[in-house]
């Protein structure tokens, strides 16, 4: 059906997954399946809201519709969903990929990340993103509760209005970690055989995103070798799981480019779900090279007995 099928799975270790029969939705003549959404609305990105006192609205999610906009939904259990205001939109055009709402416990605001469109008849498709905030006690279903704090397209802050011809934003989702916003960026490489890649950016409060990693072509997850299920397409999940001193990021992979071209060397599944693991706090770093180097940090007001550094060195290296 238009909008697709959304399914539920659970796991004790994050690797081996169980797909329970939910008996919620009939599909193919049977309700013995793990489907929790069929058709519209679509693109659920659920989270548990610690700021919500109403148990029936404990889970929240941004959702998209065939109108190509973003609305919000709530649930008591993450499986049975009700749209706020019967699915009335809270944003404008072009939220047609993955939108996300989340709670920022440090700033004590809700944050909403959606795709948007800056294209004209002259430029054609130009995809960007908008980032919005709402107060802790706001009616999240009311568009007037939301304030836009960023609207941007790759290349704008560099004065390059044609950058979108080589790389476009498909979605930007937020992951809050240690009080810092981390953007999980899904991008179309229009100048590279229309492959899809994942990148990361950071921001504090409402300041602009630091995009140096995406401009430096430093992908968060490397695509697989040609012929593997993830050799042409990497789509990151909208959140990261941190446990056992690692960050786990699930992603959807395909051996198909955005233009529909399949890898000619495909020898196994054409798509699937992958898992990327990163050592704790290991997603960004400074590298000195073999010649050594030095850095000067901002002034730090330290209270405690022990200060540690997260570093990796070669066999004869030192700090």
Predicted regions and their residues:
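Carbohydrate-active catalytic/glycan-binding domains of CAZyme proteins
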Residues: 1-319
